[in-house]
Amino acid sequence: VAHWLRDRGFDAYAVTGGVHALLGAPIPEAPPGEGGPRDWKAGAAALRHRRFQIYFGGVLLSLAGSWVEAGAFGYVVLLLGGSAAMLGIIGFLNTIPNLLFALPAGVLADHFDRRKILLLFQGGNMGVAIALAVLWATGGLTVFLMGLLAFIGGSLGALSFPAFQSMLAGTVPPKDLESAVALNSLALQVARFVGPAIAGVLLASVGPTWVFGVNAVSFLGVLGALVLLPSSRAKIASVSVGVRGAMADGIRYVFGQRSLASLMVLMVFAGMFATPPVAFMVPGLVRFQLHEGPETLGILISLIGLGSVLGSVALLVLARRPNKGEPGLVCYLLCAAAIAIIGLSTSVPLSFALALIGGFTGVVFIGLSTVVVQAASSEEMRSRAMAIWAAALVGVLPIGALITAALTAWLGAGGAVAVDGAITLLGGLGVLLWRPEVRWLGCAALPEACVAATDPASFAYLEEEVEAARAA
């Protein structure tokens, strides 16, 4: 009954209303604005705002170009004579900046004009793409230069991320923030799904120079959008405490909120143990666990991408729910279970189904977590909060990749993926037991009955609710 009420908008009254309904008493009505249907039109509400339209168009074009390049990058490394191990090293160089620079980037975005920061760093990324195109066309590109440019590009991306996320929040009023985040996620997943396919066509028809050139041109979209958008700066007078002090303030701010602290622990488990199997181990699973070839690999990767796109569409509705904790936690646990089972699976149809489920649930969890952090953070702390979120999810990926590599050497590809999924699942269950209030992430205020349910010493409150309902 509580779930039935919650699904119809009575989130803040699910427990109390459930008790009343069970005993036949009148059900308390939710105040205006706390309930009601969440339809698809409301999920796209952010598109009504001109600033978001400009931001969304520029980012979508840039993301498409970035994923076209990402789809071809590893192939170009192999064309230059690089090994499979070198692919891993270059992947490490591209992702380690998220751990090194996330927090300083958050401080930067909280204290300076975010628009100017993004113009500088995105212009730098455009320069990296131009350098790749020119070097390949002139025959000067080497594996060493690919690694160097991968590190530079990863660093510029890590320094841009908090400013991008904070600018996103400034393009819409607070009531449409969930819609903006969901649409931003949809743009990312569509670009991720389509980009590598475009890269394959370009590589086969015109070669790597055009792949890198397309990415360079795509940055004109985001740079043009940034020129049209107004300045975006948090209301902070100066960096009076210094960079280290500002970083420490951000950490205290995030981990001083129990719900955000719990969410960050979940993000670490997701980044360290759930992401490496998807990012690095799919070819190994197909070759050594399923004993299949490139056709199966292509279908499996496509199903992960399709699940991600469908998850982003579902996020348009789910992100507008007052309670984002329950659907987010369910998706986290389902994604972890899918990873664990696919590591043990020898059935191609089962693996296809699990890939679709994993792509869907993973994107929903990450999208809802983004909404929660954005909405729960004050304007002057938002960039640092998102930087910590990025460090927790993406910054730990290189460490997770090393752990997964060690597990693979010991247990094989399937065993490593199964263990990664099991650790992710146990981590989520542990957080749920440690911080039960993680189930109500995103609620403006927990209903008293929910608060009581999180504290074993307060179950007397629920007994009083039952007695009051029975008397009524």
Please place each PLM-identified region on the residue numbering.
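Rhodanese-like catalytic fold shared by cysteine-dependent sulfurtransferases
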Residues: 1-36
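Alpha-helical transmembrane-bundle signature of multi-pass membrane transport and export proteins
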Residues: 36-471
